[in-house]
């Protein structure tokens, strides 16, 4: 038991170093490449995480390059790495303003033209919608975590916040839902943990919701939750 705990700790430290050093290198390349499609080519180097750590990301489904809004659950820093590594488009993340203010590492967001929102600003929704329109006009798909913060990686999602709903309805967007399973087991920063586990990205079929339906957003959450549970139980049979 103690040896397993030590092994998990060492694995977590190694993966943290890979992320920290790898991201630092990517940020430097992003700076020089920032005017070229928001440094999308250098951002793809996130895929090196998998070869350097031996992690195999199982992918089910396909990316819909016509989808304008991507919604996915949030468990780990790796969720961003997963999509940055493999999504074919110049995606634009919607993130908390505080993340862009982190010394040096905040440049991963600011140098690449991501949307940073101030949750304390009462006019924040106006600024958010203005920024979203700008990115959509640049033909950049938007990516948002509807839970608003990291979940604990168990069976249940956190309640979806209204941000994704407001954006989708305002611009009548085609949505591609995605679910991530076990990314928190591959790397968890608080507490620092990493396990040998299978991890999976499931890309659901995209669609344009019936925005006249008052329940479309709840139905989206139910659909994602159902799909997540199916794969969660498949990858974690001992937890049923």
From Swiss-Prot:
Keywords, alphabetical: Acyltransferase, Cell inner membrane, Cell membrane, Lipid biosynthesis, Lipid metabolism, Membrane, Phospholipid biosynthesis, Phospholipid metabolism, Transferase
Parts forming coiled coils: none
Location(s) in or outside the cell: Cell inner membrane
Chief subcellular location: membrane
Enzyme superclass (EC): transferase
SUPFAM superfamilies in UniProt: Glycerol-3-phosphate (1)-acyltransferase
Recorded GO CC terms: plasma membrane
GO biological process, one term: phosphatidic acid biosynthetic process
Protein's membrane topology: Peripheral membrane protein
Pathway annotation: Phospholipid metabolism; CDP-diacylglycerol biosynthesis; CDP-diacylglycerol from sn-glycerol 3-phosphate: step 2/3
Organism domain of life: Bacteria
Family membership: Belongs to the 1-acyl-sn-glycerol-3-phosphate acyltransferase family.
Function: Converts lysophosphatidic acid (LPA) into phosphatidic acid by incorporating acyl moiety at the 2 position.
Designated name of the protein: 1-acyl-sn-glycerol-3-phosphate acyltransferase
Species assigned in the record: Helicobacter pylori (strain ATCC 700392 / 26695) (Campylobacter pylori)
């Amino acid at each position: 038991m103690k040896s397993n705990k030590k092994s998990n700790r060492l694995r977590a430290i190694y993966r943290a170093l890979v992320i920290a050093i790898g991201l630092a290198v990517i940020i430097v390349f992003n700076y020089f490449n920032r005017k070229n499609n928001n440094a999308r080519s250098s951002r793809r180097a996130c895929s090196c995480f998998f070869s350097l750590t031996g992690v195999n990301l199982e992918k089910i489904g396909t990316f819909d390059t016509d989808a304008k809004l991507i919604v996915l659950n949030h468990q780990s820093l790796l969720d961003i790495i997963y999509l940055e590594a493999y999504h074919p488009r110049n995606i634009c993340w919607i993130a908390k303003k505080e993340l862009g203010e982190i010394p040096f590492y905040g440049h991963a967001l600011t140098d690449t033209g991501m949307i940073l929102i101030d949750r304390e600003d009462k006019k924040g929704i106006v600024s958010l919608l203005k920024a979203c329109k700008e990115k959509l006009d640049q033909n950049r798909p938007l990516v948002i975590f509807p839970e608003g913060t990291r979940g604990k990686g168990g069976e249940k999602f956190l309640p979806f916040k209204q941000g994704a709903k407001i954006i989708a309805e305002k611009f009548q967007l085609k949505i591609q839902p995605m679910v991530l399973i076990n990314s928190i087991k591959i790397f968890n920063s608080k507490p620092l943990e990493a396990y040998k586990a299978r991890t999976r990205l499931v890309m659901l079929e995209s669609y344009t919701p019936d925005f006249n339906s008052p329940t479309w957003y709840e139905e989206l959450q139910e659909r994602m939750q159902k799909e997540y549970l199916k794969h969660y139980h498949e990858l974690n049979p001992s937890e049923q």
